Structure formats: C-alpha cells, structure tokens
Amino acid sequence: EVRMGVDVDKKYVDEFKPDAIVVCCGSKPIHLKVPGADGENVKVATDVLMDAAGVGENVAVIGSGMVGAECAIDLAMQGKHVKMIEMQSAIGNEIMAQMRRPLVEKMKALGVEMLPGTRTTEITGEGIKVVNAEGAEEFIPVDTVVTAVGLRSQSALY
C-alpha cells in the first residue's frame, strides 16, 4: 500500500507500523551564477517544459543533460530556433549512453545548434556572452535563455 500526501508523526508511525517510510521532498533548480541570470528573459527549463508561454523565437538552452535535451527538443518541435550551450566537451555527457545518441540525433534532425565546450559568462536582455570551444569570447543573440544546469534536492525537512 502506498500513501502519498500524508503528514507523518510518531502517532502515525505507531498506529500504522509501516515497513518503510519514503520521504520525497522534491528538488529545486540550480541557478546559473553569472551576471544577468536573474533577468526577465531567463527561464528555468522545468518551468518551460510545463508551459512554454513567454519563450521567444530564438532560444538558448544552457545545459545538455536530460532536462536540457528534452527542453531543446520540445522548443524545436514548436518551431523555435534553439542553440544548446554546454560547457563540457560533449553534448549529453550526463545522459545514459543508450539514451544520449537518440536524443542528440533528434536534436540534430530538428535543427538544434549544439555548442559543446562553450561557457556562458553573462546574460543580457539581447542574448548571452560566452567563451567558445576555441577560447574566444562571443555574443549569441537570443530572445530567451533557458537554464537547465541541474537540480538540487530539497532538504528542508532533514
């Protein structure tokens, strides 16, 4: 038997004598720590996946993990022009190999421009400043910046 949304206290445990208690506190997005990351044109990928309203036509997705890949694919399928910015040397390094290849192929097929080895240094209202894989500073004009740089577990209950 699984019970969700239950307030658990000593009385509850004594009464029901569960074999196990699983505490699922959820997670919060990790926020990018660069100038401009709190701008109005910056959105969190998990929010965009729930509702893409307010996302412009030209989008930079920062991060190429599972959430970033899903977001890039979803936005490209909506006809958005998507650039994926990844500071690691390869796209999708954090994704299981069995899933990485089909996701990367899907992004290629949808026209997502993938920029591995590229580090975001600043976000402005007009786009993002990066250091590209060759070490050169570059400005990438976009309407919207979507951050997908990871999730941190909520531990307030511990």
Name every feature range the model reports, one short phrase each.
Residues 2-20, 24-34, 38-41, 46-98, ...:
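Rossmann-like dinucleotide/flavin-binding elements
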